[in-house]
């Protein structure tokens, strides 16, 4: 289990109800879901002690792969359903790995002597990674193993309760109060529905989706806008010479520093501020953002509520990104957007795209306003706050949606590329079907294909040699026993896993494209075979060929 795999595994990133791929909350692992998280004072380790802690985690096998081997698939996948009993049963042996799994994965206290066999306990207590509770120790922060794209063993550090049971949280011992120094009890319990603006989440479906779709070509500068616990910055240091991570929440910046330090992956520059304020006139080759995109009636939780009405935060990010991109640079973000009765959502989003930028917008899911409100009310723990309070907040959400004319909310991702073109390519897709991550290279290839189509007129297209992309299959649809199919579907096995309906001429054309003959010569041969006028076929087919190239079914052969 590598390449962006966290422990425990998230539900499939494109799952609906809840759509884990596009959420700021990770409800994958668990303990009792009673509506409490903790916001301890953060660890303040030095480099040497952090290195020793990292070596202890590696020595014990506290990695994504190690946990899967320890727990076994049934217990491991049960964590995704918020069930911890199988994992607790699998960690009764007292080994160093079992102790670490209980401490950091299940967030259960372990005896001091057992922890001593796995960790430099006194250093961890002094630095705030662990808290002493009599003869036991417990974790001060959430430490989640995460598999890097090239087999690296990384760890994401966040507030307790955010990866175990979601923002709704886990039990907090009664003696945990604010104000304790590192190494002592010092947490704040959070009851269901209570505001906690400083909460910092760990790795979840949204963050891993963004990491998967990000273009990973080597760049000079990358910006992680709204870094949270630092997962995007962690990825970026592997292919960017200089990484800047920003967040409005100072605790998030501190957690991101801990994530990079504990993972030993590289360094980044951290700046506090909202949106593009910390970087002002600076430009970047890559901007990534998993912003607080939730469309809510009021900003209660910094990690999810951006403080702007409706989808204004996402629109602002898109519109302002161009001035911070270098030529050819990418901006990639997750977003929610409103479906209103007054405008088509595709037209609304296309209008956000700044001039001089190509765009690829993909809507992965849609929820009506009642589903959407219920999703985020549960996320905040409001369903545990009492019937009257829950009803009042539910009503406030629906009142805000009615006031704004919002009928539904879309979930998806937006990629911009600063091309400088006077005729930019703006593609708006609705694709709720499974895809194959990582998609970063598929995103890069999408824009390369748009460049090709933009500079190639129909006459030149017919002189181009094309080949069928790898992993394209043909399906014939029609009643049993029919001599000819009603229609033909081309389907991709990889990447976006698109499907395109074509006629028999289009299917035959695609099947002959092997990189040896020009498109025009293939059409002439098909016309002769079918007894059609080749001039008519040459005039009719470029539109279909452009569709097949644009969606990646056919690839131009260079040279």
Regions found by a protein language model. Name each.
Residues 369-447:
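Flexible, glycine-/basic-rich loop-and-beta segments that form/coincide
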Residues 111-202:
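Non-catalytic substrate-recognition/targeting regions of SAM-dependent transferases
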Residues 1-32, 179-184:
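Compositionally biased, low-complexity flexible segments
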Residues 96-142, 209-212, 242, 416, ...:
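Long, charge-rich, low-complexity alpha-helical segments
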Residues 196, 204-289, 295:
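Conserved SAM/SAH cofactor-binding pocket of Class I
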């Amino acid at each position: 289990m590598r390449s962006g795999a966290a422990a425990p595994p998230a539900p499939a990133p494109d799952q609906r109800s809840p759509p884990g791929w596009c959420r700021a909350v990770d409800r994958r692992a668990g303990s009792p879901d009673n509506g409490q998280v903790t916001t301890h004072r953060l660890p303040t380790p030095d480099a040497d002690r952090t290195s020793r802690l990292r070596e202890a985690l590696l020595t014990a096998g506290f990695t994504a792969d190690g946990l899967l081997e320890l727990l076994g698939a049934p217990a491991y996948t049960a964590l995704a359903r918020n069930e911890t009993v199988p994992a607790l049963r699998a960690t009764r042996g007292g080994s160093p790995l079992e102790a670490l799994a209980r401490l950091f994965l299940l967030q259960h206290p372990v005896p001091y002597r057992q922890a001593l066999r796995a960790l430099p306990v006194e250093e961890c207590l002094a630095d705030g990674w662990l808290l002493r509770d009599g003869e036991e120790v417990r974790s001060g922060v959430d430490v989640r193993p995460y598999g890097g794209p090239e087999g690296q063993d990384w760890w994401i550090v966040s507030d307790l309760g955010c990866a175990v049971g979601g923002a709704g949280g886990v039990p907090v011992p009664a003696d945990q109060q604010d104000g304790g120094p590192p190494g002592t009890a010092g947490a704040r319990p959070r009851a269901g529905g209570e505001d906690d603006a400083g909460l910092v989440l760990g790795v979840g479906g949204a963050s891993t989706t963004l990491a998967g779709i990000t273009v990973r070509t080597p760049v000079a500068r990358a910006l992680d806008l709204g870094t949270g616990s630092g997962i995007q910055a962690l990825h970026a240091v592997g292919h960017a010479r200089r990484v800047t991570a920003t967040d409005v929440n100072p605790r998030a910046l501190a957690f991101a520093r801990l994530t990079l330090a504990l993972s030993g992956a590289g360094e980044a520059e951290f700046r506090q501020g909202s949106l593009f304020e910390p970087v002002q006139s600076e430009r970047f080759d890559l901007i990534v953002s998993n912003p607080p995109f939730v469309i809510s009636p009021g900003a209660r939780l910094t990690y999810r509520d951006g403080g702007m009405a409706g989808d204004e935060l996402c629109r602002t990010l898109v519109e302002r990104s161009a001035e911070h991109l270098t030529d050819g640079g990418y901006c990639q973000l997750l977003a929610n957007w409103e479906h209103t009765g007054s405008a088509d959502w595709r037209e609304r989003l296309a209008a956000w795209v700044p001039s001089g930028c190509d765009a690829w917008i993909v809507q992965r899911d849609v929820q009506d306003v009642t589903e959407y409100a219920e999703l985020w009310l549960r996320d905040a723990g409001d369903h545990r706050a009492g019937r009257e309070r829950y009803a009042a907040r539910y009503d406030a959400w629906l009142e805000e949606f009615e006031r704004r004319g919002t009928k539904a909310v879309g979930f998806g991702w937006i990629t911009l590329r600063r091309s400088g073109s006077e005729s930019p390519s703006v593609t708006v897709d609705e694709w709720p079907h499974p895809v194959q991550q990582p998609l970063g290279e598929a995103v890069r290839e999408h824009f390369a294909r748009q460049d090709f189509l933009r500079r190639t007129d129909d006459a030149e297209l017919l002189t181009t040699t094309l080949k069928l992309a790898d992993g394209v299959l043909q399906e014939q649809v029609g009643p049993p026993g029919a001599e000819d199919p009603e229609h033909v579907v081309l389907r991709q096995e990889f990447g976006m896993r698109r499907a395109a309906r074509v006629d028999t001429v289009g299917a035959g054309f695609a099947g002959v494209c092997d990189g040896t003959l020009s498109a025009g010569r293939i059409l002439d041969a098909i016309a002769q075979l079918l007894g059609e006028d080749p001039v008519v076929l040459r005039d009719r087919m470029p539109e279909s060929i452009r569709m097949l190239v644009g969606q990646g079914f056919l690839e131009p052969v260079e040279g």
